[in-house]
Swiss-Prot record:
Protein name, UniProt field: Probable biotin transporter BioY
Signal peptide limits: none
Location in or out of the cell: Cell membrane
Gene3D superfamilies named among the record's database cross-references: 1.10.1760.20
Protein keywords: Cell membrane, Membrane, Transmembrane, Transmembrane helix, Transport
Any GO CC annotation of this UniProt entry: plasma membrane
Organism: Rickettsia prowazekii (strain Madrid E)
Amino acid sequence: MRYIMNSLFKILYLNRFVEYLSTNTYILDIVKIVMGVIAIFASSQITIPIKPVAITMHSVILCIIAFTYSPRLSFLTILTFIFIGVMGLPVFCQFSSGINYFLGSAGGYYLGFLIGMPVMSVLKGKLAENYLNVTIICIIGHAIFYLCGIIWLASMIGLKQAIYSGFIIFIPSGLVKILIFSCLFSYIKNLKRK
C-alpha cells in the first residue's frame, strides 16, 4: 500500500511540475535553452574533419532551433552554447573547448550563428511556412553563417583561401543539410495538420 501511495504521489507531483512549467515561462525558456544546447553539442560531434574548419551537423540543428524558438530564445541558446564552450566545457566540434578554439578558424561561424539564427526566426514569423520559403530562409541563414566565417578566416589565411576553404568546399554539404531540414520541416508540419 505504501508503494502505491508513493507512486501516486510521484505521479501527482510530476503532473504539478509539468503544470508549473507550462505556466512559468522563464523556467520553460531555461528548459528549452538547455535542450537546444544539448542538441547543438550532439550535432557538433557528427563531423567530417577537414581543415581549416570541419563539416558538422550544426546547421540542421540550428535551423530546427531557429524555426521552433523565438528570435530571442534562439539567440540565447547559441549564446549559451558558445559561452559554456569558451569557459571550458568541451561542447565544440570533436569535444574541443576554450577561448583558443573559439578564436581559431571556427570562431567566425559561431558569430554567424549568433546573427543568423535570430534572423531565420524573424523571417520564419514573417513568411508563410511552405517548402520554398523554408528553404529560402535556411539559405539566408547559411549565407550569414558563411559570410561571418569567411571574414573571420580571411584575417588568418587571406580572402581567396578563406572563400575556398570556408565556403566553396561547404556548398555541397550545406545544400544537402538545407534540403534535409526543409523536407523534415515539411513532414513535421504535415503531421501536425493530421
